[in-house]
Regions:
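Membrane-water interface at the C-terminal end of transmembrane alpha helices
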Residues: 106-128
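Cytoplasmic-side transmembrane-helix entry/capping segments in multi-pass membrane proteins
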Residues: 8-9, 36-38, 60-69
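Individual transmembrane alpha-helices with interfacial aromatic-anchor signatures
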Residues: 94-109
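Hydrophobic alpha-helical membrane segments
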Residues: 48, 64-83
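N-terminal signal-anchor transmembrane alpha-helix
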Residues: 1-42
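Interfacial non-cytosolic loop connecting adjacent transmembrane helices
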Residues: 82-97
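Canonical alpha-helical transmembrane segments
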Residues: 42-58
């Protein structure tokens, strides 16, 4: 068993599940979308992104691209959340949180593509 591949797979899967945990629930209900889950998703996705820099294969480049998309989407979601909460004194509203969750859903899709690539790479691996 290769420890590097275990750690890589762990962070790819963790990035997808933490992001999914943030986006699940009613789109316009702010009580169902914890901001700390969004921040955790950003941190885990950045760690997964850093781990993907070492792979120089074509599938590694696609892994890196999916991670870049996910991180950019999550950073945009966090920036939007910060803007909405700091621009007025009221709590975040339904339409505002739905914009944040929509961006995080885009990142979840990128994480799903990364998971599919990881499984495809694992299935096609042949022992020597």
């Amino acid at each position: 068993m290769n420890l590097e591949k275990v750690i890589f797979g762990f962070f790819v899967l963790l990035a997808a599940t933490v992001n999914f945990g943030f986006v699940v629930g009613d789109l316009d209900n702010p009580d169902l979308h914890n901001i700390w889950e969004l921040y955790a998703a950003i941190v885990v996705n950045v760690v997964a992104l850093v781990l993907k820099f070492g792979d120089r294969t074509q599938i590694g480049a696609t892994h890196l691209a999916t991670s870049l998309v996910a991180v950019l989407q999550l950073l945009a979601a966090a920036s939007l959340y910060i803007y909405f909460t700091s621009s007025h004194a009221e709590p975040i509203t339904g339409p505002e949180i739905s914009s944040v969750v929509s961006l995080a859903c885009g990142a979840a899709l990128a994480n799903f593509v990364s998971l599919v690539l990881l499984v495809a790479e694992t299935v096609s691996f042949r022992r020597r």
